[in-house]
Amino acid sequence: MKTKYSHYNNQLQLAHQGKTVFLKGFIFRKRNLGKTLFFDLRDVSGIVQLLVKENNPQYDKIALIKLETVVQIKGQVIERINKNPDLPTGDIEILVSHIEILSEAQTLPLNVFQSQESLEETRLKYRYLDLRNPEVKHFLIQRHHITQSIRQTLLKNDFLELETLILSKSTPEGARDYLVPSRIYPGNFYALPQSPQLFKQLYMIAGFERYFQVARCFRDEDLRSDRQPEFSQIDIETSFLNQDEIMSLTEEIIVDLFANIWKKPLSQPFLRLTYQQAFELYGSDKPDLRNPLKITDFTTFFDTTTCPQNMFSGNIKGFKVSKTAVLTRRKLDEYQLFFSKHFNLKLFSFVKKNDKIIGGISQFIKDDSFLKNEEICFVVSGTKDIMHKALGIFRTKLALDLSLVDTTQEALLWIVDFPLFETTQEDLPQPDLTLENSNTSNRLYSLHHPFTAPCDIAILKSNPQKALAKTYDLVWNGYEVGGGSLRINNPQTQELIFSLLGFSQEEVQTRFGFLVEALKYGTPPHGGLALGLDRLVMLFTKTNNIKDVIAFPKTQSAKDLMLEAPSAVDQEQLNTLKLKFKCNCN
């Protein structure tokens, strides 16, 4: 029988009626109606129905074919009597004249047609079978289309697709490194890159001006539903473009994606909020603007002079909502417990009915004009940063409980003017501290990374804790899908940043000596960003789990169930690397 395809399944239409075709694929479903067999043949393009009549000399053999067996068939395209409008090939079927089994399948550990209903452990262990499900396969096909759209936008803007190293050097970039021991240099280690940050800056110093790549990144950090230990990002760096120009280029990428993937228009420019505005309005630096709730300052409506001492400590802020019917007493108690347990704040709630405020603190409200009948108001008071953070989390919870998020909309915005430093950071690599500088209470940490350019050098020198950074994060429906900054192109400024972060001269030379030296030989103004490819695909495919859009993801505990990795290695391999294994696992 002819061994080449004549068509992919989804290419076949009524226009092919009467033609002989040669197809290959998996037997997806089958139905035996006594004198007629129906099969669904699945290939990468889609599904087509096969018809086998009783007079076919292979009828008895074909009737015994197991699901997921790989076959090639010869047949004639005929018009389907009972058409299926849900299939691209629903107007036709293939009258099979010959079938050849290429690989017979044994009984499968999961139902490919309904693999999404299987346990996640089973799906991940047999991921290659899970990926046969057309809905699951669609995620990765969309990933391809999204990647290609981004690539085409960058290529038309004169970017070069260049690679960077995988075996790199351990540098503090915000998480723990995955280390690779060197056989040739015992006791020394490579690190898998957390990002190509330093390499892409070196590309700019080398004069390439516009770089991008689909980069693999590795971070040994705690996992979440939208995070994996290895992930992909669209990594971009440019010379001579300012912040507005880089943000505009990024918007062009997203606008093209909406047009190519969803066939939807998207207006520019995107909304911009400063980091401070985002926290004051939404209690988050990645707010979901489909949620209509905004933090409101209600202080002026209260008579705080008559309140008990310590009832309010600062401004009184919160939300008001109109969906009071679904808020039970139990739910209100749950909200109060959330604030007291996690933030040591007291939540007050009150409602307006028949033009009268009802609630425990109604006596302290001097002006109730801010509240309409049947509206409920939630307020707290406390330290600004803690209060805003608490209200931000509560905002998300309240919107979920009351179904306030408009899921028919897409909300994109930029967050800009981040602080350059933060003063607390847990579980991250730290510089060595000398005895003279051993007090960690006022330690500074880079909010993004130590190569970010400050907005104002004078403030950086006089009051570094107040310094802002030339950074910009792209937020979509509450997810950070990209972020970047302008970089430092002055060696003195870079050394000042390292000093403020507590790195000694020896540490700087050991970890970043190559960069500091490179900055001395003429460095163009440059900046860039990275778009999280996995998160973009997750949002474009409307799934809530990032594992769905990664071909071979790991579990929440960073295990690969299919490969059974990580795994032990034999003693000979350790001896070759001159390593001795010591574990205090309890």
From Swiss-Prot:
ATP binds at residues 219-221, 228, 480, 532-535. Catalyzes the attachment of L-aspartate to tRNA(Asp) in a two-step reaction: L-aspartate is first activated by ATP to form Asp-AMP and then transferred to the acceptor end of tRNA(Asp). One of its GO terms (cellular component) is cytoplasm. GO terms for biological process: aspartyl-tRNA aminoacylation. It comes from Onion yellows phytoplasma (strain OY-M). Pfam families: tRNA-synt_2, tRNA_anti-codon. This is Aspartate--tRNA ligase. Belongs to the class-II aminoacyl-tRNA synthetase family. Type 1 subfamily. Homodimer. It is found in: Cytoplasm. L-aspartate binds at residues 173, 219, 448, 487. It comes from the Bacteria.
